[in-house]
Amino acid sequence: MLKRHYTILFLFFCLSAARAQFPAHPDSVYTFIKYNSVWSNTIKDWQPVDAGFKKQISQARTVRDTINCFLKVLEQLNDVHSYFIYRGEYFGHYKPQDSATYARLRPVLRRSQTEKEQFSTTMLPGSIVYVRVPSINVFAADEVNRFAQSLHDSVVQYSSQKPKGFIVDLRLNSGGNMYPMLAGLGPLLGNTVLGYETDMDGNEVRKWEIQNGNFVTGGYTATAIRQTGKPVFEKLPVAVLTGPVTGSSGSMTAIAFKQRPHTVFIGEPTAEGYTTSNGYFTYGNTLIFLFATSFVADRNKNMYKYAVPVDIMIKAEDDFDNLLQDAKVKAALQWLKGK
């Protein structure tokens, strides 16, 4: 009988220790997810989810066990964009890919990692400017402004060459911070509304726009770059290239070009499930929760719940080293030639 008491006390101690290490009360985090997820309405009956979470959390022995309880909820919500960062380690629910799909995407995924924060521009035949915008994972204000300014300057440097159109390549843009991306591409977008964040019912939460060359979201001016004059390319035709690695802020940047006049989308749809807007929530000093709380709509309020579609579908191998041999770039040049 005494041994049984020790066992009960030991299990209680393990459970208490796990909860003590987790920097928030698990029930409060669960309730927050349940009532604030943009996908909440997709679960018609929450009782089985409630019961499953209660059972799983009662068996949690470590912080990782506790986080796995929340990942199970994200799985049931089919939410692949939300994730936790605990002491620098990332935890999320990600859909498995078959070996053939992964083999096809692996070179692009690898390149998207090696080219982070490395813009690339060049003049192609026909006076078409090619602009590659990869992931930009910077969040400090000075870094955001530095990258926004750099991208802006990389675009406007072609003013004297009188370009006839642009190709904006987002195929290596798997996410990061959209503020420097959109401000930097302001000369192409113009001073205008770019899109909206909406709740699960499509009601506007906040508006995105370019004002005086800087990105503004919900009235907050997110960048402070020096302008070289009014947007000079806002009326030129633009071909936007996307693919299955384009996601998160890469998808947001694509949406900002949707409904822009004289604009076409070429390639493949963006990564499925990464078109939600994530809020940033902290718990103590060790836990960060990037949580999908809004959908995103373009300037005409068309919502993109799952992915950003293309106008011209081309499923072919990418050739970033020989752009004139790249099937999507060739299609973009052909489309721009007729404009």
Can you say where each PLM-predicted feature lies in the sequence?
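C-terminal alpha-helix
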Residues: V329-K339
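Bacterial Sec-dependent N-terminal signal peptides
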Residues: M1-F22
